[in-house]
Amino acid sequence: MTLFGKSVSKKLADKGFSVTKAIFEAPKFSAVPSIYQDETHQQWAVSLPGMEPAIHEYADILDCKVIENESIDVNKDMSRKDLFESVLMNPAAVSRANAGKDGKYCTSMNVMLTVKGIDGKGFVLGIPLVRREILRASRMYKLFREGADNVCEDILAMRDQADKGRSGGR
């Protein structure tokens, strides 16, 4: 029992899900999803704070990629009025866009996981990793990027394993 009820692993175990690997564990008290794997049943689960964990099959994974510096576009063609409105609406976003323009800084980094929904359409689950400017030449950037790439590799390996199972291992 944790401070706020059952632990995530206990909630998952109650649903027949056995955590064999934590692909990504979000920092405590954040609104970021955690992702767990059950290799035995070829399932994975997403847990968001305050919600019941959602269990998915490997075959539900459509794609996974790391997205960097996705923000508003501050370009030279922007009128002064448009730029002024952008600054008023979100000054931090404009500052980050300018910092990331030359490629020297990473201003945001997200792992974007595309998953098959109940209706068969894809929906995107984002895991934000970087929210402030980080110099691309820094060790911190390299650690974040390596971690993001590892999460994507693990998720895509699950998808590929499901594809092999459907095609009979060919």
Question: What residues fall within each predicted segment?
Answer:
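Short coil-to-beta-strand transition motifs
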Residues: E52-D63
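Acidic, Ser/Thr- and proline-rich intrinsically disordered linker/docking segments
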Residues: C64-R170
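Anionic N-terminal interaction surfaces
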Residues: M1-A54
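Functionally constrained cores in energy, signaling, and assembly domains
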Residues: Q37, H56, D73-K76
